[in-house]
């Protein structure tokens, strides 16, 4: 399985999860990275748009209030889930997963779920966006 792992802060305004790109939303930047990963291409639909749909994907999104490695965020999530407290400092974490569904980069959806809306509900949080697919 091939994997795309994007990480960064979700911020409002011109900020993006990957890198600052003036005048573009972070949703557009993430969608473009996904299109590149899926070997998608830009198509001219008049206003422009990406043409990349892949039927077999697994998307995991981890959220936290700190800039940590995926392992650190997963550990904090487990502590939250099971009520254990290994460290004295606690961080808020969250997790979403979409499996066996197709991703549509043009509309930035997976299995009919609007990813920009999903990510928008986590503005101000750190995000690990992990897309796995069966492409070679």
Residue ranges and their predicted role:
Residues 1-4, 36, 47, 75, ...:
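Short intrinsically disordered terminal tails
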Residues 10-14, 63-67, 88-90, 107, ...:
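Beta-strand elements of well-folded, non-transmembrane domains
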Residues 18-21, 106:
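A short, exposed loop/beta-hairpin motif centered on an aromatic-Gly-Thr core
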Residues 1-19:
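Short, extreme N-terminal segment that most often corresponds to the first beta-strand
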Residues 39-79, 90-123:
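Acidic, low-complexity, intrinsically disordered interaction modules
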Residues 4-10, 79-96:
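Disulfide-bonded cysteine-rich modules in secreted/extracellular proteins
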Residues 21-29, 64-68:
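Alpha-helix boundary/N-cap detector
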């Amino acid at each position: 399985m091939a994997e795309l792992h994007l990480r960064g802060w979700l911020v409002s305004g011109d900020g993006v999860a990957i890198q600052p790109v003036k005048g573009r939303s972070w949703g557009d930047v993430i969608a473009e990275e996904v299109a590149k990963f899926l070997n998608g291409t830009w198509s001219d639909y008049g206003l422009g748009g990406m043409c990349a749909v892949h039927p077999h994907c697994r998307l995991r999104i981890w959220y936290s209030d700190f800039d940590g490695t995926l392992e650190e965020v997963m550990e904090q999530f487990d502590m939250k889930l099971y009520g254990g407290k290994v460290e004295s400092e606690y961080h808020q974490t969250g997790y979403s997963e979409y499996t066996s569904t197709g991703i549509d980069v043009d509309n930035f959806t997976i299995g009919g779920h609007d990813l920009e809306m999903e990510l928008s509900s986590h503005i101000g949080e750190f995000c690990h966006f992990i897309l796995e697919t069966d492409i070679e």
